[in-house]
Design a protein with these regions (language model features):
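C-terminal subdomain of the subtilisin-like protease fold in secreted/lumenal serine endopeptidases
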Residues: 98-138
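Glycine-rich, charge-decorated loop segments at or immediately adjacent to ligand/cofactor-binding or catalytic sites
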Residues: 5-21
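Extracellular S/T/G-rich loop segment that most often corresponds to the catalytic His/Ser-adjacent loop
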Residues: 17-98, 102, 135-136
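Active-site neighborhood of phospho(di)ester-bond hydrolases with catalytic His/Asp-centered motifs
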Residues: 1-4, 25
Length: 138
């Protein structure tokens, strides 16, 4: 689930990301610019821990300046936010499960954490770090 865009203060992860049962994804790159003008405030990604002291988000992924779908004629537009970061992790996990089909979800989650670029100084606020897809699927 996406962490939400209400950061950077602690305890700003939104529902459903606060649930113990979901993997919550934050955006690693918080500044968004359009024609040189900042359009999203610095630190928009929701941060943990939750009110129950759960580390959230667990993992970070790129979420700024992502080409996505649009209702316009072109069919595409550039978007930013944790909702753009979450599909990066979903896709990476799909590749990893394809390579390691015998892994349980818990085993894959641990592999994801162990192979992330660490940012341990802020573990409770931003999780285990930035996703490293290459290391995840090796």
């Amino acid at each position: 689930a996406a962490a939400g865009n209400n950061g950077p203060k602690e305890n700003t992860v939104t529902i459903p990301g606060i649930s113990r049962k979901v993997l919550t994804v934050g955006s690693s790159d918080d500044d968004t610019y359009d024609r040189g003008r900042k359009v999203l405030k610095t630190g928009y990604s929701g941060r943990g821990p939750t009110a129950c002291c759960i580390v959230k988000p667990e993992i970070l992924a790129p979420g700024t300046g992502i080409t996505s779908c649009s209702k316009d004629k072109s069919g595409y537009q550039v978007k930013s936010g944790t909702s753009m970061a979450a599909p990066v992790v979903s896709g990476a996990l799909a590749l990893a499960f394809e390579k390691y089909p015998s892994f349980t979800p818990a085993e894959m989650k641990l592999r994801l954490y162990e192979r992330a670029y660490p940012r341990s100084a802020q573990l409770g606020r931003i999780g285990w770090g930035m996703i490293h897809v290459d290391h995840l699927v090796r």
